[in-house]
Amino acid sequence: MEQKTLNLDKVQISINRLREKRAKVYLFVQDTKGNAKAAVRYVYQMGMALKTAGFNPIMVHEKNDYVGVGKWLGENYMTDLPHQSIEGQNLEVSPEDIIILPEIFGFILPQIKNLPAYKIVLTQAYTNILETLQPGESWSSLGVAKCITTTSKQKEYIDRIMRNVPVEILSPVISDSFQKPKFPAKTIIAVHTRDQRDTINLIKTFYLKYPQYRWLTFRDMRGLSEQEFASTLKDCFLSVWIDNESGFGTFPLESMKCGVPVIGKVPDIMPEWMSEDNGVWIADKTSIVDYVSDFIQGWLEDNINEEMYTKMESTVSKYSDKKAFDESVCKMIEEIQIKRAESFENQLQKLTNN
């Protein structure tokens, strides 16, 4: 009888926490050692949306010496959101809690397989999905209840290989830090690549092949805070992007929001926002320098098609509504919590009847 009463009390506590938004939402974040990273910003934006709406998010990191995102994203993300390290300690996870785990933390899934919490894998980079899984392992076999991804193309890919896990799309939002400049662009070209060797090769090849443009400056966008990144981008007249593994493509959209045209290598999975008239998209990265040269000539002659700028603006407008992003995050979590509460209530009814 005492055990039954104890079980009833535990289930009722879970129901109350879910109904009152007190159930914890653990969001795992990668330590970028102070370097800006769009994938990490996305998770923090989710956390802040939940916190603002009265939910109970907790940002989880691996080590006690976590550098954090204060210097590049904003100190408010460190002070307003609770943080917890898992080094040398276990998470206090209750059945009503939610764990949101980026795909790069897949190695943790076997460790939390038997936890009663609701587990979600957050997939922004499809190339990392299988990296930490053993042959034959799937998300469903490791207790994952849901996947969140950023594009319909990635959803299609995930649906094919993780068939028993429902996938929901939550497109990133481009920060309002990125705005069109008030002054004319300078002779600077922004470069953003996944592999830094591509940046080095691009710049050296360009200067060798087109020495007449040595007066132009290339700016490697690596290692900047969000404010520095946005400020630098506003000064540029062109952006160059190389990232074969990109699942979404944040940098081109940030460039478009600043009114900066983009020349880019089409990734292995082409982003759904990419069209032939909102940028210059090519299949062979070795020819990018030639397209850059052609663009420079057109820019110097004031001969860039105005339609490109119009298409850029309409493209990025679809990813600029922060309110809609915040509402989508909260709606998703709220729906999960409502269903969980209903499930616990059914469980409570059965325990009571027995």
Question: Which positions does each model-derived feature cover?
Answer:
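Short alpha-helical segment that forms part of, or immediately flanks, the ligand-binding pocket
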Residues: 230, 253-257, 271-272
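A charged, aromatic-enriched C-terminal amphipathic alpha-helix characteristic of glycosyltransferases
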Residues: 300-353
